[in-house]
Amino acid sequence: MKVGILFSGGKDSALAAILLSPFAQIELATVSFGIVPNDAASVARVLGFPHVIIGLEAALATATVDAMIEDGYPNRGINHLHKTALERAAARYQIVADGTRRDDKAPLLNVREARSLEDRSAIDYVRPLLGYGRRAIDALADAHLEVAYGECISFDYEVELRRVMESSYGSEAVEAVFPQEHIQSRVTGRKSVVF
């Protein structure tokens, strides 16, 4: 059984891969507009999983940024983009997973949206971290991963959307739309765990 996991290079998607790996063949899939350099493949190698990049059109980035500017907040745009990323992954895999967790606001599909994705695409959509809160995720990451933290250091589409927004609307728009001090994670290694 092969599972395609949407992969940003951060701890959530890495933990999703580790949790599913005893039960499935894992392939990490990074969705990218090709706007900024993407080295998620090196993080995938550190984790020991194969990696692919799924390309998205620049027009989608522009439309997503325009929606964020209209809303003054990123959630609707991020959720729309995440749904598109899942649909693109569904064209490649029978089982699609991501690293969304219980406390996420965006990206996050509700149950109706998840069922719709599965029905329309004839796939299974798996969210192995959905029952975990932030403290549990942090504890798992601390036990199994070496992680760096900072702003815009992962390879998720938010980094590219920030760049498009800055180019089109200026840095003030980025500061107004995106939460201040949004800390991201980037996996730098995998710890050996002995039970």
Residue ranges and their predicted role:
Residues 1-4, 9-195:
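Nucleotide-activated chemistry modules centered on ATP-dependent adenylation/adenylyltransferase
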